[in-house]
């Protein structure tokens, strides 16, 4: 199966190599942009496909050249050469996966599904390449005689352990099974994430009567009306399952049934026995991860994952959780007492439900401390928060931030771009911030990069770092984007 996929990839790649390169910006050796920032607005879906296939083809040739080198393995001709390989593939992946969660489209999702098995097979071609691993192992075993510096030792260690964890020391039958598991997991994990993105952005609680929204800040009511209009329910009010849309309902809405509807919709994403249901996918992922861990000699997938993390093993995680458990439960019980008290004042009998917690905790805070999240948020306008973070970074690390949104390529109108400058006035990084929810954007928050720091000879190449969140939007009327603690 793996050989068939690789052969198909190479054949298609060679066919593409005959095409004119000038129309694909990803194939250019250097981007004709400030600091070679990817020209986002010029890249098409077909450009990604061509660059990925060409990149895999090029890296395979580079790997084969390392394996077939007649000279004895050295740090330079094996470890450094491997580290330098795949530049086109890595550059393309940095842009594609940097945008696949923040600016996804049906076309990009289809391409991601198409490429997933090819990229998995390509990764296995390297990680389970016996000839390549033997050269890496020879350098690793003889490192005491090589006079390597600290960075070279670190790269050697990471490279060797990466091969071991990738299955290089398995026998042929286990390598084949590991490769099959990798491809299945790549497909399932991608499908899981795409399903979750779909349900987060396309699951709605719709309200017809504005009186049902009593308690919500006016700005959130306006946003609900705007969302309803955008999604074909003009004159009504809609909440999707992005946190900035549904959280205000759980925190401020007096209507208990509305809070229940939102809570249940959010917690039942991908659980509707339809094409986006993730239950069977989750079970398959768990089973395959366990099989892979056992194949690699680990008792559980947690043992395998934690080996390279600070915790090292599951027992240490449980020990930390056990230390936290008692004080956490005590604090939760105190909060629960506050919630019960506030519910009794509202004439509600019985134990609190999950959709009562945020609402009544906020009411308890108001009563006990004469303060509410809504009041605090007036001081947390998004641009003020950003400037506060930049001020802190300057005081702690001497970093300054200069906005360059209008000067640099943009992948979406909501994102901003910044130069990051050190105490000496040197540009040390490009920073892209992207803070508002939208269709095609994954839930949550993350830090990533379009390009890592590297050196091109003696010249340092600045990293392009991204910070992506889903914070509260401004109102349609141009009101402030107020955040909560």
Feature-to-residue mapping (PLM):
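Bacterial Sec-dependent N-terminal signal peptides
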Residues: 1-22
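Hydrophobic alpha-helix feature that most strongly marks membrane-spanning transmembrane helices
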Residues: 267, 472-475
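Short His/Asp/Glu-rich catalytic/ion-coordination signatures at enzyme active sites or charged loops
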Residues: 32-47, 96-115, 138-180, 240-280, ...
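Acidic/His-rich catalytic or pseudo-catalytic neighborhoods
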Residues: 284, 465, 478
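N-terminal helix-rich structural modules
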Residues: 21-217
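Active-site-proximal, well-structured secondary-structure segments within enzyme catalytic domains
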Residues: 155, 187, 194, 198-240, ...
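Short pre-active-site segment immediately N-terminal to the catalytic Zn-binding motif
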Residues: 474-485
């Amino acid at each position: 199966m793996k050989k068939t996929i690789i052969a198909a990839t190479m054949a298609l790649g060679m066919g593409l190599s005959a095409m004119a390169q000038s129309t694909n910006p990803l194939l250019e050796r250097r981007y004709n942009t400030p600091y070679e920032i990817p020209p986002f607005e010029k890249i098409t879906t077909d450009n990604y496909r061509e660059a990925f296939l060409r990149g895999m083809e090029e890296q395979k040739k580079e790997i084969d050249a390392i394996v077939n080198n007649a000279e004895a393995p050295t740090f330079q001709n094996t470890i450094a050469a491997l580290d330098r390989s795949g530049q086109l593939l890595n550059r393309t992946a940095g842009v594609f996966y940097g945008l696949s969660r923040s600016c996804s489209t049906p076309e990009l999702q289809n391409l991601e599904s198409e490429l997933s098995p090819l990229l998995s097979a390509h990764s296995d071609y390297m990680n389970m390449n016996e000839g390549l691993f033997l050269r890496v192992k020879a350098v690793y075993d003889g490192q005491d005689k090589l006079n390597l510096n600290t960075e070279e030792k670190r790269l050697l260690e990471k490279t060797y352990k990466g091969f071991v964890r990738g299955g290089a020391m398995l026998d042929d039958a286990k390598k084949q099974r590991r490769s099959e598991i990798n491809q299945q997991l790549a497909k399932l994990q991608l499908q899981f994430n795409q399903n979750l993105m779909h349900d987060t952005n396309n699951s709605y609680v719709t309200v017809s009567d504005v009186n049902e929204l009593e308690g919500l800040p006016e700005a959130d009511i306006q946003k609900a009306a705007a969302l309803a209009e955008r999604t074909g329910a003009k004159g009504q009010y809609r909440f999707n399952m992005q946190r900035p849309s549904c959280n205000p309902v759980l925190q401020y809405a007096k209507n208990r049934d509305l809070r229940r509807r939102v809570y249940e919709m959010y917690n039942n994403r991908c659980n509707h026995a339809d094409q986006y249901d993730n239950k069977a996918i989750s079970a398959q992922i768990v089973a395959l991860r366990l099989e892979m861990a056992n194949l690699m000699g680990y008792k559980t997938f947690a043992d395998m994952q934690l080996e390279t993390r600070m915790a090292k093993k599951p027992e240490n995680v449980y020990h930390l959780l056990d230390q936290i458990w008692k004080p956490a439960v005590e604090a939760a019980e105190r909060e629960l007492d506050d919630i019960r008290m506030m519910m009794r004042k509202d004439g509600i009998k019985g134990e609190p439900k999950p959709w009562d917690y945020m609402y009544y905790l906020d009411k308890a805070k108001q009563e006990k401390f004469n303060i509410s999240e809504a009041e605090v948020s007036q001081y947390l306008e998004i641009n003020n928060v950003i400037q506060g973070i930049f001020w802190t970074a300057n005081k702690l690390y001497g970093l300054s931030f200069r906005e360059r949104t209008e000067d640099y390529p943009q992948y979406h109108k909501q994102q901003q771009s910044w130069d990051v400058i050190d105490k000496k006035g040197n540009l040390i990084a490009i920073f892209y911030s992207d803070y508002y929810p939208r269709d095609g954007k994954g839930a949550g928050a993350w830090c990533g990069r379009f390009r890592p720091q590297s050196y091109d000879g003696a010249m340092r190449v600045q990293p392009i770092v991204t910070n992506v969140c889903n914070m509260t939007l401004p109102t349609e009327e141009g009101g402030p984007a107020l955040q909560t603690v």
